[in-house]
A protein has these predicted regions:
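Hydrophobic transmembrane alpha-helices of multi-pass small-molecule transport proteins
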Residues: 56, 120-126, 133-152, 286-303
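Hydrophobic residues within membrane-embedded alpha-helical segments of Major Facilitator Superfamily
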Residues: 17, 24, 31, 51, ...
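Alpha-helical transmembrane segments
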Residues: 83, 130-141, 191-203
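Alpha-helical transmembrane segments of compact multi-pass small-molecule transporters, enriched
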Residues: 51-55, 110-124, 139, 201-206, ...
């Protein structure tokens, strides 16, 4: 790591991490889509969170990360725990629901809501003014979703699936945006690996509680140990919930939020391409236009 840090500035390294995060996450989404054919969203989320939590423990030890970092207060721990519950237990479960209903390509377009939602939350919570460019970018993203869904006749998806798929996706992005917003101040004062692990632990515990109180808890727990489910779920977890998550948190720590978010948003392009190639999802002109509008809107928002 020292050699890498010597070759690149922290800001450049953060940008590289953000781009790699987008690539790994796009591949993971394809695998998670395949996993969702055998595992329900709640059990799939618990599986990937539990495996990622366990995988990160030896990484923390080898990296020499202080398990009880100095300079943090009880409030900081509480913020990260809440961030993990909202951003992992709730947001990721909603994302998997959206992925099952929409498919990878359309879900990638919904992901473009992430940037406008961050701006909206900062306006509602922090009373930050909304600029003309931010408003324009948000409208472009909304246009992308309308282009992708209005008057779409797809045999494999009903109007109800499209509606709920986009609602689940929008809710997932909202919860994720909120979790990032409250996490950032603590992240500036702590190891990104440590922050990632604490959020994972909080999210995993919350998911276990959610499964225990679910009426289908026996099936949900059973699917966690069914070996046939590991074919896609395990590599998806390695790429998406372990590598991509570590890179994601590290990127936000080492470079500006806007730079990291813009590069993260390139996952939209990767997902649409991979979905067409690996999942044989239709790559129509309408979907291409929606992807361009969504990506363009996200960039306009972040540059504004």
């Amino acid at each position: 790591m020292g050699l890498i840090e010597g070759m690149f500035t922290p800001d450049m390294l953060g940008k590289i991490f953000a781009f790699l995060c987008a690539l790994f996450w796009a591949l993971a989404v394809i695998l998670f889509k395949k996993s969702g054919e055998a595992m329900k969203p709640l059990s799939l989320n618990l599986y990937k969170s539990l495996v990622s939590t366990l995988l990160l423990i030896p990484v923390l030890i080898l990296a020499g990360v202080d398990l009880l970092p100095e300079g943090l207060f009880a409030r900081d721990y509480l913020i990260l725990i809440v961030s993990g519950i909202i951003g992992i237990a709730i947001s990721d479960t909603l994302f998997f629901k959206s992925l099952n209903l929409l498919g990878a390509g359309l879900t990638a377009i919904v992901d473009c809501l992430y940037s406008p939602i961050i701006i909206l939350l900062s306006f509602l919570i922090l009373l930050n003014p909304v600029s003309f460019m931010e408003l324009t970018g948000g409208l472009l993203v909304i246009s992308a979703i309308l282009v992708a869904t209005l008057k779409v006749k797809e045999k494999e998806r009903s109007t109800r699936d499209l509606l709920f798929g986009f609602l689940y996706g929008a809710a997932a992005m909202t919860f994720m945006g909120f979790s990032v917003t409250i996490m950032k101040p603590v992240l500036d004062r702590a190891s990104s690996l440590w922050v990632t692990e604490l959020r994972l632990i909080a999210g995993t515990i919350a998911l276990i509680v959610m499964v225990m109180f679910n009426k289908d808890r026996r099936e949900l727990f059973t699917s966690l140990i069914r070996r046939s489910n590991f074919k896609y779920a395990f590599p998806a977890t390695i790429l998406g919930s372990f590598l991509a998550l570590v890179l994601w948190v590290s990127a936000f720590k080492m470079t500006s939020i806007n730079s990291a978010a813009i590069l993260n948003q390139t996952n939209t392009i990767f997902i649409v391409i991979f979905a067409s190639f690996f999942l044989k999802e239709k790559f129509t002109f309408r979907r291409l236009l929606a992807t361009i509008l969504g990506m363009g809107g996200s960039v306009v928002v972040l540059l504004g």
